[in-house]
Amino acid sequence: MAKIVDIKGREVLDSRGNPTVEADVLLDNGIIGSACAPSGASTGSREALELRDGDKSRYLGKGVLKAVANINGPIRDLLLGKDPIDQKALDQAMIKLDGTENKATLGANAILAVSLAAAKAAAQDQDLPLYAHIANLNGTPGVYSMPVPMMNIINGGEHADNNVDIQEFMVQPVGAKSFSEGLRMGTEIFHHLKAVLKARGLNTAVGDEGGFAPNLASNEDALKVISEAVANAGYTLGTDVTLALDCAASEFYEDGKYNLSGEGQVFTAEGFAEYLKGLTQRYPIISIEDGLDESDWAGWKILTDKIGEKVQLVGDDLFVTNTKILKEGIDKKIANSILIKFNQIGTLTETLEAIQMAKAAGYTAVISHRSGETEDSTIADLAVGTSAGQIKTGSLCRSDRVSKYNQLLRIEEQLNGKAKYNGRGEFRG
């Protein structure tokens, strides 16, 4: 049995040029596992705490030297001599050492980087791909599927500097026969979208997640230009390709109302739920994330009752990968899907528990990146190893996004038909 002999933390940069945490876990046989913690822009209020230094003389206060010191000090001391394969024991030990509900003492960014680095070291120690080790930890050894990518090709909201209120407009290649074919379809649509925008004289600069970020007449206008790009790429909207939204509604929820400032419209929860229902009737939108504010559970119930039978309603800020909050949502029949982000909860073990709880209740689980990413591609292995079926990892440019897609291509090739791509079968309706 290999043992942990050293743990090292360091400050590195994420895709927005902000510091984040990287950790190395070294074993006594020379194996090293390394992982980086991502960082979000539109964040749920109940997420685990990302520890920042607050020292305005460094990185505008966004340094993470405190989190790094926690890795190199108390976390290292705690885990030396431990077995990296016992992921649950490692994670529970760090949770206990932290002693807070939201990991505010050590920082979720510190704990997560070590948690994932340990998993990578353990996989190498067993001569397993990371996805196979994750499947073992998940209690589903040898069971894999390739995820349907939800490709964010128009960015708005907090992910872009434009007038579009809805944060993400995504395409899903549900008609593909494999992940690699789906990736090709999405990439072709992305390039055709650029041409559509250029023809309109619109900006083709990209946002945080690699999608285009033009100023448009309305949120629906984004759906129109995407529809045109899909057709120009030679695909049929609704059969080959479907659409998805991430409203990130908490970002435009003010005084109990939903304020679409880009359109000059203000809605009640009932009104905004009806607005979204109208979009699903006019376009093949089969998934909507954070359609209402994280605290507006009454509004979420209205939305779920209106369209939840046919549309995947994903809780991101709503559930923050937290099993306690997810259980409450399941009990109250709020939403029907959870977005899974490692750093919202802070350990691999708790992430797997959230996926398992969702699946047991008939909810889907969508594996997701954050807007602040690195070259770390762990979420690709997580999606395959848990057979989650869906992944959100941005658009078809920026290496911080493409690194995940490329890892999925490698995994699909390695599994050589043993991991099915289920396409439309992963969704409701």
UniProtKB/Swiss-Prot annotation:
Broad class of enzyme this protein falls into: lyase
Enzyme Commission number: 4.2.1.11
Catalytic residues, chain numbering: E209, K341
UniProt keyword list: Cytoplasm, Glycolysis, Lyase, Magnesium, Metal-binding, Secreted
InterPro entries per UniProt: Enolase, Enolase-like_C_sf, Enolase-like_N, Enolase_C, Enolase_CS, Enolase_N
SUPFAM superfamilies membership: Enolase C-terminal domain-like (SSF51604), Enolase N-terminal domain-like (SSF54826)
A Gene Ontology cellular-component term: phosphopyruvate hydratase complex
Predominant location category: cytoplasm
Binding-site residues, (2R)-2-phosphoglycerate: Q167, K341, R370, S371, K392
A single MF term (Gene Ontology): phosphopyruvate hydratase activity
Cofactor entry: Mg(2+)
Catalysed reactions, semicolon-separated: (2R)-2-phosphoglycerate = phosphoenolpyruvate + H2O
Pathway: Carbohydrate degradation; glycolysis; pyruvate from D-glyceraldehyde 3-phosphate: step 4/5
Binding annotation for Mg(2+): D246, E289, D316
Entry note: cofactor: Binds a second Mg(2+) ion via substrate during catalysis.
Family: Belongs to the enolase family.
Known function: Catalyzes the reversible conversion of 2-phosphoglycerate (2-PG) into phosphoenolpyruvate (PEP). It is essential for the degradation of carbohydrates via glycolysis.
Name this protein carries in UniProt: Enolase
Provenance organism: Pseudomonas fluorescens (strain ATCC BAA-477 / NRRL B-23932 / Pf-5)
Species classification: Bacteria, Pseudomonadati, Pseudomonadota, Gammaproteobacteria, Pseudomonadales
